[in-house]
Amino acid sequence: MKSSHLVKKDLKVVWHPCTQMKDHEKIPMIPIKSGKGVWLYDYDGVKYLDAISSWWVNLFGHSNAYINRSIKNQLSQLEHVLLAGFTHEPAIDLSERLIKLTPSKITKCFFTDNGSSSIDAAMKMSYHYWQNKKKKSKVKFIALSNSYHGETLGSLSVSNIDLYKKTYENILKETIIVESPDSYNKSENISEEKHAEIMFDKMYKTIKKNHRDVCAVIVEPLIQCAGYMRMYHHKYLELLSEACREYNIHLIADEIAVGFGRTGTMFGFQQAKITPDIICLSKGITGGYMTLSTILTTDDIYDAFYDEYEKLNAFLHSHSYTANPIACSAANATLDIFKDKDVIKKNKILSAHIRKCFESLKDHPHVSDVRQKGMVLAIELIKDKKRKVSYDWKERRGIRAYLHGLKNNVLMRPLGNVLYFMPPYVI
């Protein structure tokens, strides 16, 4: 079947995510038939380099032989069983392994099915904890400006990008927003670490003022990915962790996009040597194969729900495919590869090579910044570099770059005026 025929069929029946469908009157839809390694192949035999890991999920290449075998083996045993009142080996193994990868105070694993739902569940978990502890005034959340935590009503409430949020403001929970420590906006004469310290003063004052009413602070460690790949120094996380402990507030680390080696460590928060109260994981957890997410947390939070049934203190959050055995098997295979292939160490070498490839762009008259943390590199386009005047978003410079990439067999998905490179680790 030809790609053109599939496009016609698709546009009659499929409503695509995060897309203005009218764009496809001019912008080509790309039907993909197969994938192998870092390459995707359409129905006409044209191949595309997956430079964004298919929305940041694919870690070890498409059709990875090891993950394929793990999934096939699981398919022959058990495709699914409910996790309420039942359990299975893949879920137990995955929980144990994730807990071992995190600080010693992290002891429990709760399963959800995608990134947004894990944020919703984490918010409910924190709020419900304080209710069970009779701290009834703790009902609010603090988040950073330019943050993105998902598009369900809960996760969107703690996000701060108008493009996704503004239309729905009237039905969202009000959140306290504090200015992001984003290093892009720092003064040239100070370091990123010093900038983080200066910016944290705003967060500290907000926590001090509102702590009696706040359940948790939620942040994306080190990189605000959907927030135009803006990055900040880990010093901010150190200070934030201290403040949350001082004022008895939970710290929720949204590791959905940055976890599993993206920033140079297994998890972004580890660079600050802190222990969040709640850690949300998804995207790369299954190597890019299936939807799955987890929430890792402490005995302190778990114990607040452990009670006689009649007291109605249980955490009654669930979904039908909780800890699906096939997805858990893919996740366990992914962790096997991390261990057996020494991925974190190899990524340091690979990220240094990627940095060299893009260094020359720093001097381009329409590039204001080339920034990188681990296996994430972003290029900020600008109209006037000297005056720091950005391109009007209506010019859609990112889409121009996207189309240019397709012509050169590279699949990108720019964020406004920001191009980014976030490839599988096998590139």
What are these regions (language model features)?
Residues 1-427:
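Conserved N-terminal phosphate-binding loop of PLP-dependent enzymes in the Aspartate aminotransferase
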